[in-house]
């Protein structure tokens, strides 16, 4: 009996410690690798979406990607939530200089160390594209109204 209680208590401690990592995000946000993510269906231009993300959570920005795993997670989130008529979802990358080069930083200030860009053009903002199953980033007009994904550190 004592051994059973010890094992049960040990499992409870493990469960509570593991569930605590996901519980760090607000209940309507998703957790992945120490960050919180939320897809917002309302459509905004890039600048308004970035501002909105910063108002939703401390340290919040349009989503940045640091790995294939993070991209896969966000693509699944977008695919589950986006309306069938929407073609794009904003991400936190835009062209920031006169030479039409991508900024070396995401809107959250992190370095662009992982890239999945298709078709660089003179348009300045990037979005995930439905035609490519949201796996690639495409340059589109920043004033376009699109849904978006916010990313933040846990509160």
Curated annotation (Swiss-Prot):
SMART domains, A to Z: CLECT
Keyword Disulfide bond (UniProt): yes
Signal peptide: 1-23
Disulfide bridges in this chain: 25-36, 53-150, 125-142
Family matches, as Pfam families: Lectin_C (PF00059)
Keywords: Blood coagulation cascade inhibiting toxin, Disulfide bond, Hemostasis impairing toxin, Platelet aggregation inhibiting toxin, Secreted, Signal, Toxin
InterPro entries documented for this protein: C-type_lectin-like (IPR001304), C-type_lectin-like/link_sf (IPR016186), C-type_lectin/snaclec_domain (IPR050111), C-type_lectin_CS (IPR018378), CTDL_fold (IPR016187)
Cell compartments where the protein resides: Secreted
Binding partners and assembly: Heterodimer of subunits alpha and beta; disulfide-linked.
The protein, known as: Snaclec bothrojaracin subunit alpha
The species this protein was found in: Bothrops jararaca (Jararaca)
């Amino acid at each position: 009996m004592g051994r059973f209680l010890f094992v049960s208590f040990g499992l409870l401690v493990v469960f509570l410690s593991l569930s605590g990592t996901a519980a760090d995000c607000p209940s309507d946000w998703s957790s992945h690798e120490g960050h919180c993510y939320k897809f917002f269906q309302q459509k905004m231009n890039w600048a308004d979406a970035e501002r909105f993300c910063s108002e939703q959570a401390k340290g919040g920005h349009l989503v940045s990607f640091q790995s294939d795993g993070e991209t896969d997670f966000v693509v699944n989130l977008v695919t589950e939530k986006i309306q069938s008529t929407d073609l794009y979802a904003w991400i936190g990358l835009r062209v920031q200089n006169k030479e039409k080069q991508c900024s070396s930083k995401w809107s959250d200030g992190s370095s662009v160390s992982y890239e999945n860009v298709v078709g660089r053009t003179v348009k300045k903002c990037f979005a995930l594209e439905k035609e490519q199953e949201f796996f690639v980033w495409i340059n589109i007009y920043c004033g376009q109204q699109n849904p978006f994904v916010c990313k933040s550190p846990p509160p």
